[in-house]
Structure formats: C-alpha cells, structure tokens
C-alpha cells in the first residue's frame, strides 16, 4: 500500500484518510519513513527554511487555551510585559538576520491587537525594514482585514495563526474562541496579500486519528508552512501532567504530515528540545524542512547556528529563497 500511495502522490493524487490511518497503525515504520523522505525530496528539494520570533508582548491573555503559559486563567511563572519598543524589535531582527535567518516574526499574547497596538507594531515593522532586509511575519491573534492591511502596508508578508489541533479536539482545549474565527483571520490575511503560516501542537492528549484529521484539515485550507510544536507541559496549566509522546509517535506523525501535505514546509517549533539529537536528525530525514530557531516564546528552542549546521549535515541547503503559496484560494 505504501508504494501505491507514493506513486499516487508523485502523479498528483492524495492519500485517503483511511489509508493514513492504516499507515499509522500497521505499516512498517522504516518503510513509512523512507517513503516520506522520498516525497519530501521529490516535492520540496533540498531547501531548508529558517525563521525566528520575538515575544513582543507577554502574558495576561484573556483566552483559556489549556496548553498556554500566557493565559491569565492559569498561575504560571511567565514574565508579563506590554509591547516592546520599535528599537528593541529592530535590534532583535537585525541580530537574527546577521545569523543568516531569513524571516522574523513579532508575536504578541492576547486574543487580538487593538488598533493602537497595530499602529505601534506598524512602526516596529517600518523600523525593522529600515535596518535589515529580513522578511517580516506577524502573529497577533484574531485580526480584522483592516488591521491586517495596515500590517501588510508596513512590510508584513506572512501572517501566522495556528489552528492548533484537529477540529474534533479543539473545543476541549479552548472555550474562548473557535477555529472558525481563526479561519476568518487566515482568509482576511490572504485577501490583503499575505502568505499564511499555520500549524499546531501535538501531544496534548489527542489520538493519532486526530493528528491525521489535523493534517488533512491544514491541507484543506491550503497551508504551506506548518509549524509542528510538541507540547512541553508547563506547571500551572491544565495540561501540566500530560505524558510525553513517544519518539516513534512523533516520527510517525511527521511522516504522515508529509504524505498528507507533500508541498508544505514542515517546521521544527517549540518543545523540540525534548527530542534526542538522533530523533531530530531522523525527523529532518523524514520530512522536517524548516525551523523556528532561537528561543521560542515560553519553551526552550534551539540556537540558529546549531540548527543550520544540523540541516546541512542532513543534506539540506539553508536558504532564504523559500516562498510558498504561489497561488491559493481566498
């Protein structure tokens, strides 16, 4: 069956949900990994995309996402502060560009950003573009088309809005907003001309079937940059005692995400420090071809130089010429 699916993918077809379930439950794992590797190289070549983020506003979020240290609903040790200045953001962006990183995102806690905050962010992005040629991304919650247009007009080319998990599982993790609201933001971002980056977190108690559901969901909304975070349970949050994924579960998930999303950048993200170096290498071999590098929000990330060296050792070229979404549905 694996060979049949590989041939179908190469000829423009797709796996079915039922086939993905069978691969997860009964396929020889090494054969699955090898197939995902070949599909990665066939559709994506040897380019490896890098980006970095800065937590431009931290804590006091009114939303109740059960995994998140930023929520005011939970007693965590997260540092709380308002928006960083344009100067600080630009200095961080320039530093990351000097490390060879191609993209830089301002990430802010909260359900949304006020118009005043959007104007402050616009100033930050203008300052960044004056200082460096790094590509600008933003992750500021649920935004209207008007606010997204302001960001786009000030240099933001990519908007990040994680769908987080499978539609069947999301309501059990968050009650203060819906995935449909996230989809509305993604559609608005595309209407103003932005690319979209959207992924989520695995290991929050979802089943493998729900991970497959999630991968197909992202495919259905034409996402071509998919951060795959691994839950790092944070004391004080409802998920603090969630048991970790096994290494095999993680690698199988990466392989299935690759077969379901053959043309996407699958991106190392938060929580990956839990993985051994050998598993990180294996994940890159199987299908990871991008990374959020540096320190990631409230969990431990990975230093840029180390990530780039790892990608090169795994046969990739670290490049800034990795645009996605040549065309997409509005």
Swiss-Prot record:
Residues 43-272 form the Radical SAM core domain. Gene3D superfamilies: Aldolase class I. Pfam families: BATS, Radical_SAM. Its cofactor is [4Fe-4S] cluster; [2Fe-2S] cluster. Its EC number is 2.8.1.6. Pathway: Cofactor biosynthesis; biotin biosynthesis; biotin from 7,8-diaminononanoate: step 2/2. It catalyses: (4R,5S)-dethiobiotin + (sulfur carrier)-SH + 2 reduced [2Fe-2S]-[ferredoxin] + 2 S-adenosyl-L-methionine = (sulfur carrier)-H + biotin + 2 5'-deoxyadenosine + 2 L-methionine + 2 oxidized [2Fe-2S]-[ferredoxin]. It comes from the Bacteria. One of its GO terms (biological process) is biotin biosynthetic process. SUPFAM superfamilies: Radical SAM enzymes. Keywords: 2Fe-2S, 4Fe-4S, Biotin biosynthesis, Iron, Iron-sulfur, Metal-binding, S-adenosyl-L-methionine, Transferase. Transmembrane segments: none annotated. InterPro entries: Aldolase_TIM (IPR013785), BATS_dom (IPR010722), Biotin_synth/BioAB (IPR002684), Biotin_synthase (IPR024177), Elp3/MiaA/NifB-like_rSAM (IPR006638), rSAM (IPR007197). [2Fe-2S] cluster binds at residues 105, 137, 197, 267. Binds 1 [4Fe-4S] cluster. The cluster is coordinated with 3 cysteines and an exchangeable S-adenosyl-L-methionine. Binds 1 [2Fe-2S] cluster. The cluster is coordinated with 3 cysteines and 1 arginine. [4Fe-4S] cluster binds at residues 61, 65, 68. The keyword 4Fe-4S applies. The keyword Heme does not apply. GO terms for molecular function: 2 iron, 2 sulfur cluster binding; 4 iron, 4 sulfur cluster binding; biotin synthase activity; iron ion binding. Catalyzes the conversion of dethiobiotin (DTB) to biotin by the insertion of a sulfur atom into dethiobiotin via a radical-based mechanism. HAMAP family: BioB (MF_01694). NCBIfam families: bioB (TIGR00433). Homodimer. Belongs to the radical SAM superfamily. Biotin synthase family. This is Biotin synthase. It comes from Porphyromonas gingivalis (strain ATCC 33277 / DSM 20709 / CIP 103683 / JCM 12257 / NCTC 11834 / 2561). The gene is bioB.
């Amino acid at each position: 069956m694996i060979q049949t699916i590989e041939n179908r993918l190469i000829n423009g077809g797709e796996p079915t949900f039922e086939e993905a379930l069978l691969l997860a439950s009964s396929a020889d794992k090494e054969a699955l990994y090898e197939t995902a590797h070949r599909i990665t190289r066939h559709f994506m070549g040897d380019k490896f995309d890098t980006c970095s983020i800065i937590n431009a506003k931290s804590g006091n979020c009114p939303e109740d996402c059960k995994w998140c240290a930023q929520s005011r609903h939970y007693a965590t040790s997260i540092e709380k502060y308002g928006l960083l200045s344009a100067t600080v953001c630009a200095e961080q962006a320039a530093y990351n560009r000097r490390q060879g990183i191609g993209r830089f995102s301002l990430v802010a806690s909260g359900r949304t950003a006020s118009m005043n905050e959007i104007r402050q962010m616009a100033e930050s992005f203008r300052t960044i573009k004056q200082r460096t040629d790094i590509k600008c991304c933003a992750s500021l919650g649920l935004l209207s088309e008007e606010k997204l247009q302001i960001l786009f007009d000030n240099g933001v080319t990519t908007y990040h809005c994680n769908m987080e998990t499978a539609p069947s599982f999301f309501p059990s993790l968050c009650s203060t907003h819906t995935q449909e609201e996230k989809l509305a933001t993604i559609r608005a971002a595309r209407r103003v001309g932005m690319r979209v980056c959207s992924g989520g977190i695995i290991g929050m108690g979802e089943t493998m079937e729900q991970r497959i559901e999630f991968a197909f969901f992202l495919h259905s909304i034409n996402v071509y940059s998919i951060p795959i975070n691994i839950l790092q349970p944070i004391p004080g949050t409802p998920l603090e005692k969630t048991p970790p994924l096994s290494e095999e579960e993680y690698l199988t998930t990466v392989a299935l995400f690759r077969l379901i999303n053959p043309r996407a950048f699958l991106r190392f993200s938060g929580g990956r420090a839990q993985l051994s170096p050998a598993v990180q290498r294996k994940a890159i071999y199987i299908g990871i071809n991008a990374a959020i590098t540096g320190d990631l929000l409230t969990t431990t990330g990975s230093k840029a130089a180390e990530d780039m060296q790892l990608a090169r050792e795994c046969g990739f070229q670290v490049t800034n010429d990795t645009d996605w979404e040549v065309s997409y549905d509005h």
